[in-house]
Amino acid sequence: MTISDSRRTFLKASAAAATASAAGIPLANGTAAEAQAISTGIRWDKAACRFCGTGCSVLVGTKEGRVVATQGDPDAPVNRGLNCIKGYFLSKIMYGEDRLTMPLLRKTNGVYDKNGTFEPVSWDEAFDVMAQKWKEALAKKGPTSVGMFGSGQWTVWEGYAAAKLMKAGFRSNNIDPNARHCMASAVVGFMRTFGIDEPMGCYDDFEHADTFVLWGSNMAEMHPILWSRLTDTRLTKPGSEVHVLSTYEHRSFELADNGMVFAPQTDLAILNYIANYIISTGRVNEDFMSKHVNITKTATDIGYGLRDEHALQQEAENPNSGKLEPISFDEYAASVAEYTVDKVSELSGVPAAQLEKLAEQYADPNRKVMSLWTMGFNQHTRGSWVNSLMYNVHLLVGKISEPGNSPFSLTGQPSACGTAREVGTFAHRLPADMVVMNDAHRALTEKKWNLPEGTIPAKPGFHAVLQHRKLKDGDLNAYWVQCNNNMQAAPNMNEEGYPGYRNPENFITVSDPYPTVTTMSADLILPTAMWVEKEGAYGNAERRTQFWRQQVKAPGEAKSDLWQLMEFSKRFTIEEVWGEELLAKMPEHRGKTMYDVLFANGKVDKYPLSETAEGFDNDESEHFGYYVQKGLFEEYAGFGRGKAHDLASFETYHQSRGLRWPVVDGQETLYRFREGYDPYVPEGEGVRFYGHSDGKAKIIYAPYEPAPEVPDAEFDLWLCTGRVLEHWHSGSMTRRVPELHRAYPAAVVYMHPEDAKARGLRRGQEINISTRRGDMLSRVETRGRNKVPQGLVFVPWFDEGQLINQLTLDATCPLSKETDFKKCACKVERA
């Protein structure tokens, strides 16, 4: 009797899996998954997690065209088989009952009407109306009248296609990602200090550090997998310590050896105190400083990123200035000398002994320190400053760019690094850290994209907060939102957000898988494929680029953001978007569409369908007739290769669990700027911060300056917003997972028991929380995971039934243009 091939394969794979399991050996070649697939009918394949910037890898199980299970990928170096609670329920995020499956257009009596009701339409009709509105705006006001708001959740090639469409096609820099709300201050900190973006260290530092310091980061809930690695080191490595700083006590404090609750905005003063402590105790690494660091100070009194007519902007001496001035070490030492332990303790509310204990961790030359931060630093009206102040401390002692010594900026979105930052989807950026303001950068980009000289505008476009202001003012008229829920996420929504969306001069398109606050404010809704319904790539917080295959098809007529971008480009001739002056420089483009010039250009369309993976769908490639993702990736990768942003070949990423760039000669880079790790550091130099032409990093002195809005007699509490473990961002995915919704069904206002008592409030009681911009009903919570100090309340923003961003202030860091969601004044009253 002959055993069938499938049966023989099953027996062989099962035996291998059993043997490996008994020995504790993971099977990297997929043999165990093969055995499980044969026995259950489930196919397993890898993908990057859809949620945060940690970049966990998961195994996706599909059966009969549906994702039926996910599990942690045991071969993934990031998460080593673990998931957080959100990751374990990934299989359910695509199957909410209200999934969008057809384009919806506001209509009355069968024609588009801004005040009409949503009706299903075909893709052709949707794009016909949308293209007409964009053409009308371009004809009337030019390229600055059109814009796009994108995402750190776009795949790498979606972000690249969007940036190319806007900057090369429509000649508008009015494209910005929602990463402006979360990572822009980190970017400015990197660029000013090092001349190049993204962390120099990697997750391996969690196993090498002696001390971990969290600044404005609740890793226990927001980066739980990384927290598990940190926790493992703390519990197994003798002498290791955890220090946590925040404006309220959260779950990360449970592991803290030194937990510090400080007054909002005073992190600026604390960091200057640490620098002063290092200098005054004689622990400056003078050799490192003399070889590798220049010292500067920044312009001060720079305003708060508010409208120009706002009183605080009018009063600023140097509004929006990022000017740096060289200073001597003695001048720097004198500047930080005023930040004594007594002064900073009084200002911040942190006991002096705790501040000294913290400062000693950095000063002690025998301790390796990993500093970690995220939104508490970045969503800050001095976010760019506070990022640089963090680097100042590490540079003073030379604790940087080596295992365990790592100032590490954590990211919140799965590809805020890989797409928003590296691709250049910000209003001022181009691929590989280039910027539109630089003539040489624009010229290089135009050459690579085969564009006439002068195609890309030299002036930065409208950033996220400015986009809302320009929509409201009627200067931005045709607007496309993809892969975010900005009407729930953006600040001061009532005054600056919603009016622009409903301005009768404007046409708003929103692409999303689900109905959201943003889609319901739009004129046209486009149904979007999500996660493994398309082939994708993300770049995580440690510079790791990861790919996945399309696993299942999107429901109904839903299409990926990439398909939408490329298909929409076919609706415009080059004559309609460029004009005669540019066309005269490249007459060979006459008569072509934007699609022909940007995508069917001999580069993007050079890889045949035969190169796509056998056994997997690839809907975009099948539609356009070539391997779209590979073409876009290889064209994009050409910007960074040889320029310290090297990416590996396309196929390499499908065969691996990701690589950390720069990838040179097939080798990833764990530590940048350090000889022996980074191929861009010449032999014999030891350390070279090559982002700056002189190879040196910058210490940037900046003082403490207060927040723009502080509690007073009427609005007597600080309002801080943020996230919780169970939900991600606006909850548009996680609230459709029944288990996650039940675990945390509604937002609450976390309040100190004494503050509640003083207002006659009890736990669970309905209250009204208000600011100068609006009010909202909620319920008071005086217990639970978040223990706030007196004078401050914390409110999560995931709940579309409680739009807390009606209340927040649209103040930003004037340099990064990132919103401060952590500090404004509010009051709480009985409802």
Curated annotation (Swiss-Prot):
Primary localization:
periplasm
Tell me which species this is from. Answer: Dinoroseobacter shibae (strain DSM 16493 / NCIMB 14021 / DFL 12)
Which sequence ranges form a coiled-coil region, renumbered to this chain? none
Keyword vocabulary terms for this entry: 4Fe-4S, Electron transport, Iron, Iron-sulfur, Metal-binding, Molybdenum, Nitrate assimilation, Oxidoreductase, Periplasm, Signal, Transport
- Role summary: Catalytic subunit of the periplasmic nitrate reductase complex NapAB. Receives electrons from NapB and catalyzes the reduction of nitrate to nitrite.
Q: Which SMART domains match?
A: Molybdop_Fe4S4 (SM00926)
Keyword Nucleotide-binding present in the record's keywords: the answer is no
Does Iron-sulfur count among this protein's keywords? yes
Residues bound to Mo-bis(molybdopterin guanine dinucleotide) are 86, 153, 178, 182, 215-222, 246-250, 265-267, 375, 379, 485, 511-512, 534, 561, 721-730, 805, 822
Q: Which cofactor does it need?
A: [4Fe-4S] cluster; Mo-bis(molybdopterin guanine dinucleotide)
Biological process, per Gene Ontology = cellular respiration; Mo-molybdopterin cofactor biosynthetic process; nitrate assimilation
One GO cellular-component annotation of the UniProt record comes to:
periplasmic space
Q: Where does [4Fe-4S] cluster bind?
A: C49, C52, C56, C84
Q: What is this protein called?
A: Periplasmic nitrate reductase
Q: Any binding details for the cofactor? A: Binds 1 [4Fe-4S] cluster.
**MF term (GO), any:** molybdenum ion binding
Gene encoding this polypeptide?
Answer: napA
Q: Where is the 4Fe-4S Mo/W bis-MGD-type domain?
A: 42-98
